[in-house]
Amino acid sequence: AWDGTDVLFPIDDGGNVHLYRVGADGTGKPELVIGGDRQVTGFDVRGGRVVFTAGDATHLTDVFVLDTDGSERRLTTHGDRFVALHPPVAPERFTATSPDGAEVEAWLIRPVGFAEGGTYPALLNVHGGPFTQYGNRVFDEFQVQAGAGYAVMYCNPRGSSGYSEAWGRAIRGPIAEVDPGSGWGGVDYDDVMAVTEEAVRRFPFIDGSRLGVLGGSYGGYMTSWIIGHTNRFKAACSERAVNNLLAEEHNSDIAGIFKMYVGATHLDAPEEYLRQSPVTYFRDMHTPLLILHSEDDLRCPISQAEELFVALRMLKRDVEFVRFPGESHELTRAGAPKHRVMRFDVLLEFFARHLLS
């Protein structure tokens, strides 16, 4: 609480995370307390002061205090030395128009060493969730990709947080009784493809014949879905993905969640679960694919990856599969350092082979 009469809370806000307050009795409209093009990652309140951590697109997270007079002070400079040695490339914001007219917020990071007149391959990143967001923070994945010579694209398609309830609920299934939408692989797919084409049009240094796509969890789902519905990308990496929604409801540690999205249980509408599953479109997948998965993943069990790999091998498609023993769904964020480095090495070698050579 702010002073016993207010409640403070963070909210995703168009790529940012801001801090708001509202009356503890529920009256009044929420009031912005801490804003800006940045993401607040934690906070506490004492004596009318708010101590919080925040970072933005070119600065790592540090500690700040908002004093009682409304002034703000930075208390730590932990990230300055790293940023001085490895300056993050600032993103450029743009928007793309989806086929139904929806405006999708997106960003592009130019490759390190960018030179006017040159052409570069590009990687489209799709976030997990799906109810989360990309935005104004330093993300090591993007900086590593840019450092390897890629233009880096990312966006917040429908299903993401940070925009509106309607935006987040747009990918609920068409059979849902409340707020029916397109289902997974509907308008979200349209949005990420619109962003891809807009980036190629807007940034002439992107070589549209050398595009890659990658993502983890829901982002892995979307990667698998994309290559089952278009050959636009020259290479893809599907990581810790959901490839079979029906199987996910049987053996995941979040079994039951898809009732909220699909609009019915897997027992009542198995055909709808399969319609929205990449497994249904294996025969349409022709893009060279790298599959990355942790063997101890309980969120998206490794059988999700095995199903994809075995099917594509049976179809004699170009597919590679790397398994990480002893790792969970959190490999990229909390895995063993040796495995996190190995993952980057495998990922970059794969895309270099297909997009840089």
Question: Where are the language model's segments positioned?
Answer:
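Peripheral, non-catalytic segments that deliver or gate enzyme domains
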Residues: 1-119, 130-148, 175, 197-201, ...
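Conserved residues at the C-terminal ends of beta-strands
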Residues: 53, 126, 239
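Structural cue for short, hydrophobic secondary-structure segments
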Residues: 125-128, 144, 154
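Histidine-centered divalent metal-coordination motifs
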Residues: 105, 127, 329
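Active-site-proximal cap/loop segments of hydrolase catalytic domains
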Residues: 154-357
